Amino acid sequence: MKTLSEFIVERQAEYPNAKGELSGILSSIRLLAKIIHRDINKAGLTNILGQSGIENVQGESQMKLDLFAHNTMKAALMAREEVAGFASEEEESFIAFDTERGRNAKYIILTDPLDGSSNIDVNVSVGTIFSIYRRVSPIGSPVTLEDFMQPGNKQVASGYIVYGSSTMLVYTTGHGVNGFTYDPSIGTFCLSHENMQMPKEGKIYSINEGQYLKFPQGVKKYIKYCQEEDKATHRPYVSRYIGSLVADFHRNLLKGGIYIYPSATNYPNGKLRLLYEGNPIAFLAEQAGGVATDGYRRILDIEPTALHERVPLFVGSEDMVKKAQEMMEEFKEE
């Protein structure tokens, strides 16, 4: 079975001018995935469950594992000579690696270090999301905010690690999506899901229906559409919502479905972060044949206006996302 290391080397060989910088970053992400996997698996036996007593920049209570994952990722990336800077959902501002090595590096990383961390206490799957861009500021100087405020269509790689019944690393560099499952007996990620493709049609819809009364009319209509019986379109669809973006998206990637986190009266701009969640997940979805929008626009074409900008997210199987968007457009003026 092909290992992640072998796969990275093999893919790099396809590009004669490649210098191995992106491969080095992916190797660091592989290492931090092992570290976070190890600590999540013993979370109930050590003092890293529960809240830390600290709020992040979003005003949300940080879990102890949020901080652990954030610090682990920052340390792993700072050790790489290819990384010029780092931005995390857990930090108010970006971090410029202001050393000679960092100033001469080409890439920046954005991450949600531990998505769905509130689920850890009840032993539900969580994940790490990452996004990689080439910097746009001059090489030789520290990175600037401009480097991080790029639209998602400028990503050179994105991916996630899902920590569940098994730990999987799924990523794309713009040439398809591949998944690697961690074998703890040998300490290696092995290629288990090659050239992943999201089904064009799906039967699963994932949304927090407890917020139904606060949703836009287009979302309400789509939920009703999913629940109606119609043999021709294989409805009613199945409702599955874990509450962890990575876990919900991963299931729908494999089986076909739509994940929706819309705007609502209590969060009119949506709740997920464009740079840390929306863009990397949208890049993966499109590379696997899926679609990702904010209900009206392609996620990857949105020009960011703030480091922690929020966005509604409709992502998944092409036919399902397009149907949801059709219903959103119907009520656009309301």
Swiss-Prot record:
- Where in the cell is the protein located? Cytoplasm
Any GO molecular function: fructose 1,6-bisphosphate 1-phosphatase activity
Pathway named in the protein's UniProt entry? Carbohydrate biosynthesis; gluconeogenesis
Q: How is the cofactor bound?
A: Binds 2 magnesium ions per subunit.
Q: How does it assemble?
A: Homotetramer.
Give the protein family.
Answer: Belongs to the FBPase class 1 family.
Name recorded for this polypeptide: Fructose-1,6-bisphosphatase class 1
Record lineage: Bacteria, Pseudomonadati, Pseudomonadota, Gammaproteobacteria, Pasteurellales
Gene, per the UniProt record: fbp
